[in-house]
Amino acid sequence: DEDVMNIIRVEKPVGVVVAFGGQTAIKLTKHMAEHGVNILGTPPDAIDAAEDRERFDELLEQLKIKRPQGFTVMTCDEALEVANKIHYPVLMRPSYVLGGQNMIIAFNDDDIKEYMAIILDQGIENPVLIDKYLMGTELEIDAICDGEDILSPGIREHIERTGIHSGDSIAVYPAWNVSDSLINRIIECSKKLAIALNTKGLVNIQYIAYHDEIYVIE
């Protein structure tokens, strides 16, 4: 944080674009905004709404867009309670992380205990996300939005099963194993989300196609 702010004080930029810096830049957005830095593009509050599980779930409910059943937890006991409530297998990952970093598929209580021990040992700051694992087809769309409309070059289909870090996944473009109706649904949901979040610039949304339904992952 201090290194970035030192550079900003020296360079005195008109504003800062965080869309090209990965998760590191996303995490710095709130800090920079609180220190008076002009964030160009998507507003900091909109970025937080996309990253915060409770706020994002509320938005999806308003837009009538489905997502796998899931909860946030801070302790191992909470994680075990949630996993047994929604039933194994479950997908576990830290919040405020893009692309499935540090993500696992847990099949039993021992997996939960081992994962939470590692996360808690690292010093947890944000909740851990636990979702019902759906063995479907993972799809991903990149687009650019001006706040009123979106433009996307297409939809990628991941070859690996859902739950694999996107940086380690192979994807094909365009998606070849998905019906036209599901593709149209993805485009429709992506436009709704991008506009509802007041997106100005790049947006990436990941979905699961499962039993002819579309679910948002992140």
List each language-model region with its residue ranges:
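N-terminal beta-alpha lobe that positions the nucleotide/phosphoryl donor
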Residues: 1-205, 209-218
